[in-house]
Amino acid sequence: MQPTVIETWPAPAKLNLFLYITGQRQDGYHLLQTLFQFLDYGDTLTIQPRDDDQINLLTPVDGVENEQNLIVRAARLLQQHCKRHNIHPAQFGADIRIDKYLPMGGGLGGGSSNAATVLVALNHLWKSGLSVDTLADLGLQLGADVPVFVRGHAAFAEGIGERLTPANPPEKWYLVAHPGVSIATPLIFGDPELTRNSPVRDLETLLNQTFVNDCEAIARKRFREVEQLLSWLLEYAPARLTGTGACVFAEFDTEFAARQVLDQAPEWLNGFVARGVNVSPLQRTLSGQL
């Protein structure tokens, strides 16, 4: 059966349900333990294969040159890999549009998710036949978070984020909010007060403890908007930072409870409600076509 041409592909958000910094390598990279879960919410990519080798991003993202955008870089990386390995699909280019809902610098993995969706979608649409492992290895060249999106299952990550173990945390509802600022990851990881000596623990131990993000204290100290947002959310539910920020999230057992709090939110709060899912919307879309 020939793969069906799918034009619309999800690029879901992720949350770091916890994030512990356990050390730092000599090359400066931080060692961590984190738990990734996807949201049933994110950007949408519309992809139309081309008969030539042009990669066209038809909806430029403000502040990002097209050739530097992870969407274009992912497509070109896949092209180059196919050429090197004498894989010559009949269709080898693409016109790509993005409907952008996830904030840049928000800690929701938007850019990494976009890259992963391009790798997975074009592998399918071009009929390249590459394995998930190969796509994940390509994704790692684009960013440490790309492989988890390629693999499409919630995961416990260790090392510098490259060692992934599938996990099945509870699928709760989340109120995710953006404080209106963008936080550059190096700003957090470069702070001398960042905790870098959290003990290494196994996943079972971590799942039975209160979830913490070691980056949160630094984000709250440096950005009053993050402090204000977390302080408000914590009045209603457990809440914390995702990634290095700037987005924060509060967890609820039901959609109704999450929406009740969002309905009470002050005007300055910009947020949405979404469900945590252990199988990503991208994986569900792909599985429905094979």
From Swiss-Prot:
Q: Where is the active site?
A: 14, 145
Q: Which GO terms describe its biological process?
A: isopentenyl diphosphate biosynthetic process, methylerythritol 4-phosphate pathway; terpenoid biosynthetic process
Positions bound to ATP:
103-113
Q: Which reaction does it catalyse?
A: 4-CDP-2-C-methyl-D-erythritol + ATP = 4-CDP-2-C-methyl-D-erythritol 2-phosphate + ADP + H(+)
Q: Which Pfam families match?
A: GHMP_kinases_C, GHMP_kinases_N
* PANTHER family in UniProt: 4-DIPHOSPHOCYTIDYL-2-C-METHYL-D-ERYTHRITOL KINASE, CHLOROPLASTIC
What is the protein's name according to its record?
4-diphosphocytidyl-2-C-methyl-D-erythritol kinase
Single GO molecular-function term? ATP binding
What assembly does the database describe for this protein? Answer: Homodimer.
Functional note: Catalyzes the phosphorylation of the position 2 hydroxy group of 4-diphosphocytidyl-2C-methyl-D-erythritol.
Q: Which organism is it from?
A: Pectobacterium carotovorum subsp. carotovorum (strain PC1)
Q: What is its EC number?
A: 2.7.1.148
Key words, A-Z? ATP-binding, Isoprene biosynthesis, Kinase, Nucleotide-binding, Transferase
Family named by the database record: Belongs to the GHMP kinase family. IspE subfamily.
- According to its UniProt record, in which pathway does this protein act? Isoprenoid biosynthesis; isopentenyl diphosphate biosynthesis via DXP pathway; isopentenyl diphosphate from 1-deoxy-D-xylulose 5-phosphate: step 3/6
